[in-house]
Amino acid sequence: MKKELKILIIANIALLISIIHYTFDLLTLCIDDTSKDALTDEQLNPPNGFNSTFYESPPQLIPKIIHQTYKTNDIPEQWVKGRQKCIDLHPDYTYILWTDEMSDTFIKQEYPWFLDTFRSYEYPIERADAIRYFILSHYGGIYIDLDDGCERRLDPLLKVPAFLRKTSPTGVSNDVMGSVPRHPFFLKVIKSLKHYKKNWYIPYMTIMGSTGPLFISVVWKQYKRWSNTAENGAVRILQPADYKMHNNSFFSISKGSSWHTGDANFMKTLENHILSCVVTGFIFGFFILYGEFTFYTWLCSGPFNNKRYYIQWLSDKFKLHKWKLTSSYKNKEKRRNPTRHEYNSRGKRLRKDSNIPYDSVFLDIEKNHAKFTDLT
């Protein structure tokens, strides 16, 4: 095998390992259908209800608190009905609407180590995302987005230590979540926020990856892989049919997203044109392979075979440049601070009004002049 081909193969393997390392959690999301962690129909809709003498109801774990967030107390009209329905269905629950001012004060008092990061988020929705993780970890309860309205009581969801909901096409979402106080998963979530605070230049991707559903999906995969998820550390997943649009669903969705902007609509358009995205991906991959082929032919070409010559040439150039700089510096130092011997060895100017030393440079006439060196 040619040496150039070995170099190309090693470089590709190193690149592939690096890509897999940084995207491993995203790749595993594609093959995780959440079925092992799903809340079952028996848990959510027991036969004859929880009060049946034939069914022993599990104990309540999550406290009866409903959390929601908004900028102020003035809720947009399209979300008022859904919010009020949640309150009316749960008169025995504590309801808290977290405004921006309340959220900032809470972080400042309870989690001052995160305050600078919290205030430095570029988009308000990132702060709205972050605060929900902190309040669930601190107080426990159920968090519900304002565009999610309640369709039935949430009591069955209180029987597990923590839950998220499955989203499409893969992963979990953060619009409906529940937890006991200080659940290990949400402790990991709040500790991971600083690490994932990155600007991806596209607002949709920045929000999704720093605090949104993509962020919590990645942390969830890491938690499942490295943590003890048995018993009280478990995180159960609410399936789409139990979430909305079915007879026994817990929630309904109101019109009007709470944060999506123009680039989000673009991403949604891509989702609806999967085939076009796949074709574009293949075209992009072709150009990458063509670029690698071009690079390989360059490696095998004549100029690169003389690489030792070019490396030596560059090395000599560098050494010469370094020597010139060093010599120039030393000469300047000598002129600036001559030794006594150097000072005395210099000639004197012939003018009486000037005694400044100078370097005497005289031609040896007898050796250099043609008139005196011609012995013929």
Curated annotation (Swiss-Prot):
Kindly report, in one word, the top-level EC class recorded for this enzyme.
transferase
Give the knockout phenotype. Answer: Exhibits a reduction in the synthesis of mannosylated sphingolipids.
- GO: which molecular function terms? inositol phosphorylceramide mannosyltransferase activity; mannosyltransferase activity
Q: Does the keyword Membrane apply?
A: yes
Q: Is the Hydrolase keyword given for this protein?
A: no
- Highest taxon in the source lineage: Eukaryota
Which residue intervals make up region (Disordered)?
331-351
Query: Which of the residues bear the PTM Phosphoserine?
Result: 354
**What biological processes does GO assign it?**
glycosphingolipid biosynthetic process; mannosyl diphosphorylinositol ceramide metabolic process; mannosyl-inositol phosphorylceramide biosynthetic process; sphingolipid biosynthetic process
Short name of one Pfam family: Gly_transf_sug
List the transmembrane segments.
Answer: 7-27, 274-294
| Record keywords | Membrane, Phosphoprotein, Transferase, Transmembrane, Transmembrane helix, Vacuole
How this chain sits in the membrane, per its record, is: Multi-pass membrane protein
Q: Which GO terms describe its cellular component?
A: fungal-type vacuole; Golgi apparatus; mannosyltransferase complex; vacuolar membrane
Q: Which InterPro entries is this protein grouped with?
A: Glycosyltransferase_domain, GlycoTrfase_DXD_sugar-bd_CS, Nucleotide-diphossugar_trans
Q: Which reaction does it catalyse?
A: a 1D-myo-inositol-1-phospho-N-[(R)-2-hydroxy-very-long-chain fatty acyl]-(R)-4-hydroxysphingoid base + GDP-alpha-D-mannose = an alpha-D-mannosyl-(1<->6)-1D-myo-inositol-1-phospho-N-[(R)-2-hydroxy-very-long-chain fatty acyl]-(R)-4-hydroxysphingoid base + GDP + H(+)
Q: What is its EC number?
A: 2.4.1.370
Annotated localization: Vacuole membrane
Mention any additional remark.
Present with 195 molecules/cell in log phase SD medium.
| Record function comment | Involved in the synthesis of mannosyl phosphorylinositol ceramide. Catalyzes the addition of mannosyl to phosphorylinositol ceramide.
> How does the record describe its quaternary structure?
Heterodimer of CSH1 and CSG2.
Q: Which family does it belong to?
A: Belongs to the glycosyltransferase 32 family.
Name of the protein in its database record: Mannosyl phosphorylinositol ceramide synthase CSH1
Q: What species does this protein belong to?
A: Saccharomyces cerevisiae (strain ATCC 204508 / S288c)
